[in-house]
Amino acid sequence: MKSFYKSFRTPSFLALAVAAALAGCAATQDAGHSAMNMVKSATGQAQVVRQDVAPALYQVAYSPSEDVVYAVSAGNPKDPASGVKPKLFKLDPETLAVKAEIELPKPGYGLTLDDDAHRLYIVDTRGGTLMVFDTTSSQVTASLTMPPVLDAQGKPEKIEYREIVVDKANNRLYLPAMSYHDSKLQVVNLETLTVERTIPGFNFGATGISMDSGAGKLYVSNLMGQLFVVDIGTLAITDRFEVQGDQLLTLVMDHDNKRLLAVDEGFDRLDVVRKERGGLNYQTRTQGNQVLALDPSSGKVLQNIKVGTQPVDLLLDAPRNRLYVSNRVSGNISVVDPRTGQEIKTIDLPTHPNSFALNPKTGTVYVTVKLPKEKSMTDKESVARISF
């Protein structure tokens, strides 16, 4: 998700709020990691294995067919002479030892896996390049640089990419294109690897996306408390809801309970960004630091789930009734019962726990853990394995 923390004046400052994809700045105590720790609670224990891997780690994926963990590193694009190259890592799912590392042609940030097709889709958040990685040959087999998006004056707009959703039934990818003004949704045709449609109208900071393929709907959220519904058949926005939430960074569909789960981040400087960069006269609705359960048909808040400070990513393990939330600033993972909203346990993972992946067979969770921004591009960041 990540540094983008130089000043409010830099165009990429919007990505400060997108810490699930990009690096951040708040610093707490950290150390090297290669050992197993036991996290105790009244409901049992969690075993945590943590291993340093590489600088600039972002998203992670687990492949059931290969039984490996993939983690992507952006390298150090600001200092090519540093020798820190963008890479994709294959990790042992038990020990997290590096089994292979493959250099990428562009920095990798966002990552999603189509395991049946043996494909990883990797996006360069800043440069807008989508890479197709064949997991059988361990090679990037194709790439697409997103076309420029023009603003109202016909000038190229600064766009950043974070999440990728695979629509296998329609052979498409969906990528929110985040901007300060009119965010877009890019629809990529996988047969031709071209942009099939650019859908405008998602306003300031569209980041969250989730698909309900059974209902034929996409849900997209932004950083000004709005939830959009897109019809997958027509690729039209059919609804827009004003949610009693503020920074809807990440979305997950809870199919069993027919609701959406949304991070309400609580990034303390976003109001300044909305005003100075977005030109918005926006009234803050909440203080954030929570997960919202939403009615997808209306955007109504059904439940407020308090978590740690500045949550960024969500992972729902529905068969085991566990919702995992990475809390960036408090440096921990909240494990929540999604039915009741009650916290099951808290797992400390300083400095900044980031993005999740799940082994659906065992329930083992993998999470990238980032360092403070001054170390993120040079020192090794880690991947943690959580099991019960």
Where are these regions (language model features)?
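Predominantly soluble domains enriched in secretory-pathway, periplasmic, or organellar proteins
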Residues: 25-388
